[in-house]
A protein has these predicted regions:
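Cross-family detector of peptidyl-prolyl cis-trans isomerase
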Residues: 1-124
Length: 124
């Protein structure tokens, strides 16, 4: 897979996590406690601008799923993906960085849109 283009056109701020499978993978399924490798692009809903992308660093993000190493929207949204899959996550600020945001990077109260590619799963 290659770096996705993330569009916010026609997207409204959700109150709950929105999960859209763009491609269902055929590899191992990601479960809580697994170490996962995820390539992603993240944009803010308000301006559609990219604030982060693992693709630009040439290396996926590795984390343990479901233990709070990432924002809650990711812990919930990546679970159930299969290796080789691509999923769009529309994450309300309550499941991201909340009213404070990340100064200079993400505005307070911002809805975040991620397109995530699950590239690896390692068992517990």
């Amino acid at each position: 897979m290659s770096k996705p283009v993330v569009s916010v056109e026609g997207c409204e701020a959700p109150e709950e996590l929105v999960i859209i499978d763009e491609k269902i993978g055929d590899g191992d399924e990601a479960k809580a406690g697994d170490v996962v490798d995820v390539h992603y692009v993240g944009v803010g809903l308000s301006d559609g601008k990219q604030f982060d992308a693992s693709w630009d660093r040439g290396e996926p993000l590795r984390f343990t799923l479901g233990v709070g190493q990432v924002i809650p929207g990711w812990d919930r949204g990546v679970q159930g993906m299969r290796v080789g899959g691509r999923r769009r996550l529309e994450i309300p600020s309550s499941l991201a960085y909340g009213p404070r945001g990340i100064p200079g990077v993400i505005k307070g109260g911002e809805t975040l849109i991620f397109v995530c590619d699950l590239v690896g799963v390692t068992g517990r």
